[in-house]
Amino acid sequence: MAVQFEVLTGVDGARLAIATLDAPASLNALSLPMIEQLGTHLRAWAQDPAIVCVLLRGNGSKAFCAGGEVRQLVEACRAHPGEVPPLAATFFAAEYRLDYLLHHYSKPLLCWGHGHVLGGGMGLLQGAGVRIVTPSSRLAMPEISIGLYPDVGGSWFLSRLPGRLGLFLGLTGAPINARDALDLGLADRFMKEDQQDQLIDGLLQLNWQEQTTLQLNSLLKALEQEAREHVPAAQWLPRREQIDRVLDVSDPACAWRAIGQLEHQADVVLAKAAGTLLKGCPLTAHLVWQQLQRARYLSLGQVLQMEYAMSLNCCRHPEFSEGVRARLLDKDNAPRWHWPDIAQVPAAVVEAHFSKVWEGRHPLADLA
């Protein structure tokens, strides 16, 4: 199993459930079986009155979760050119249902987001009730580099960031550290890497029969106080004003050019982000622009329904397969995009990514 499940019993007989992503060789990238296992156990734990709290974490020092296992998806896309592969329809439906479940979980759900927290890993972290980051945390939605787009609810949480930071992070795939995550409302608590055992011990010592919220908050607060001096310096809020000015534009092509002009700036953080965009997928930039505009007033369920259509349509078009080939399979880092110029991406192609590609009722129609 690529996810390990265990249940520990606390001092008062209450039980703590722990789910550990256990595929460190792939940085705990989510495969369909892992997603299905998580969904099954989380639903069972929600119904078990003996389970009082859930902790979601990843094995290995490098990553909580570096995204979805897209290699298998691309193999399926290549086997079904121009179509929606059955694996894609199943994978994205299961993943988005899992994300929705996390956001609406009925019990305290903590997620330990150390190391790389990318793509699908962000979907898991953002769904947790207590999102914990560490000195090694690097959170990002880097889909611009592989011809996909920030999914797993990215439309929802990026569109709600201050100013135009969500648009910037979606377009550039730029990583944020723990301080950034706390500042932007993408994390709740900061702890050191070596405090996880203390956290588990503390959870097992709590009296889960009364004043649960107060006790849990006191535990988290105490651990965070111990770690306070290890919080890294902020990167993105100090640059927000400049980013807002740069992205005060009317369309994605202008945004592409405006960010691109930062590539040779002395500010290495902005320059690196600009370089990533300029090597990225122009179609993705259009999708990011559109998804954030459309998601602004949507519920999470509506966002995931929209993203389901987008993801299936990405599987029908060549950019996703080509991006994964260049970045993850052949690793030549030289993608040959079908539309290499952002100004030449047809508006009809962008719009088509939001259209249904299934018969009858939306497969995620029950997500409120």
What spans do the regions from the language model cover?
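Gly/Pro- and small hydrophobic-enriched strand-loop and loop-to-helix capping segments
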Residues: G129-P150, G185-I200
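Conserved CoA-thioester-binding segment of acyl-CoA-metabolizing enzymes
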Residues: M1-R57, Y100, A368
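Hydrophobic/aromatic residues within transmembrane alpha-helices
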Residues: L56, E69, L124-L125, D180-A181, ...
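Contiguous mid-protein beta-loop-alpha structural module that forms a pocket-lining wall or clamp
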Residues: G153-S155, R160-Q215
